[in-house]
Swiss-Prot record:
InterPro entries recorded: Ribosomal_uL18_bac-type (IPR004389), Ribosomal_uL18_bac/euk (IPR005484)
Similarity-based family: Belongs to the universal ribosomal protein uL18 family.
GO molecular function: 5S rRNA binding; structural constituent of ribosome
Protein known as: Large ribosomal subunit protein uL18
Species annotation: Nitratidesulfovibrio vulgaris (strain DSM 19637 / Miyazaki F) (Desulfovibrio vulgaris)
Keyword vocabulary terms for this entry: Ribonucleoprotein, Ribosomal protein, RNA-binding, rRNA-binding
Hydrolase is among the record's keywords: no
Assembly: Part of the 50S ribosomal subunit; part of the 5S rRNA/L5/L18/L25 subcomplex. Contacts the 5S and 23S rRNAs.
Length: 119
């Protein structure tokens, strides 16, 4: 049986998650990409709690132009950095969730770095 793109992504995700884990001092910034929206959340793996979350779905109601493109993904990165700053989170571990570090995933990372997150 041939492997689909999504199956390959899931294998990469498992391989990546073996190597990285978020802690209380340095939580994990997870990015998920669907066909319509980009989601980002900061997770503390020690407690299993989501500390901060946002998406183009949430931002789109507040700002025009927050679509599922690079510009919208960059807005998600800046928003997650702003929300993390409110919870005094400065350093995170970036989890690309099996996606290639390109396009919208890279735009989220660049936006988060511009917003002040370190990774």
């Amino acid at each position: 049986m041939t492997m689909t793109k999504n199956d390959a992504r899931k294998r990469r995700k498992v391989r990546i998650r073996k190597k990285i884990a978020g802690s209380t001092e340095r939580p994990r910034l997870v990015v998920y990409r669907s066909n319509l929206h980009v989601y980002a959340q900061i997770v503390d793996d020690a407690t299993g709690a989501t500390l901060v979350a946002t998406s183009t779905l949430a931002i789109g109601k507040a700002q025009a132009g927050a679509h599922c493109n690079k510009a919208g993904a960059e807005l998600v990165g800046k928003e997650i950095a702003r929300l993390a700053g409110e919870k005094s989170i400065k350093r995170v571990v970036f989890d690309r969730n099996g996606y290639l570090y390109h396009g919208r995933i890279k735009a989220v990372a660049d936006g988060a770095r511009e917003g002040g997150l370190e990774f």
